[in-house]
Amino acid sequence: MNKLVKVWQIGRLSYRKSLELQKHLVRLHHENKELSNTLVCLEHPPVYTTGIRTGQYPEQVAKNLEQLGAEFYRTNRGGLITFHGPGQLVVYPILNLKDFKPSMRWYVCHIEKTVIRLCNKLGIEAGTSPNTGVWVKDNKICAIGVHGSRFVTSHGLALNCSTDLTWFEHIVPCGIEGKGVTSLSKELNRHVDVEEVVPLFLDSFSEIFGCHYVDFPKKECDNILADLIQ
């Protein structure tokens, strides 16, 4: 438990700004800044995002989704299309895997284990499938799509807490036919907000990844966000 990860709880942030923030934090790693391992925890306004395989999402598809009141972004993460929005805990781990284990497969597996442990803490039986992510039976509760650059990770996971699941009706989530989506609130039949889930996620991440965490220094947070807003 000697590895240290800084936790940055932002609240609501646009997807565009989150991309800029991730690039900044990745750059800190590549500049060999100390103590750069960071978990960014936030929620997004409604947005559909695709991964590196974007051929099946022509511009008309993007326009149709935007007409629903959501943004649309193409990204360099793995995976196909998914939705982010209010009531969903999005976590972007910006980690140097050389501080853990330099393997993207190991990393994705441990992200899945983290979310499964979180679900277990709430009394939900969750697991994996041949498809990436965390599932409750045939319904995906957490999407995972990551990117690695010289073993520095970006993008991450999206866990449905109290998400409006009707947003997913307009897409084939993660490109997987015949499967559904669910949320912590739906499975527990009560409202489960992001604020309740964050501490459970952090504890589960600490246990699975063998690290401990501290809050990201507020002054450093303010300085970075000020640069992004300009």
Which residues make up each language-model segment?
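N-terminal lobe of the biotin/lipoate ligase/transferase fold
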Residues: 1-135, 140-141, 166, 191-192, ...
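Short, conserved beta-strand/beta-arch hydrophobic-aromatic motifs that form part
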Residues: 56-60, 141-161
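A structural signal for short, well-ordered beta-strand segments
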Residues: 91-93, 132, 144-146, 157-161, ...
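Non-catalytic surface loops within mature trypsin-like serine protease
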Residues: 97-99, 148-150, 161-163, 188
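C-terminal accessory segment of soluble enzyme catalytic cores
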Residues: 166-230
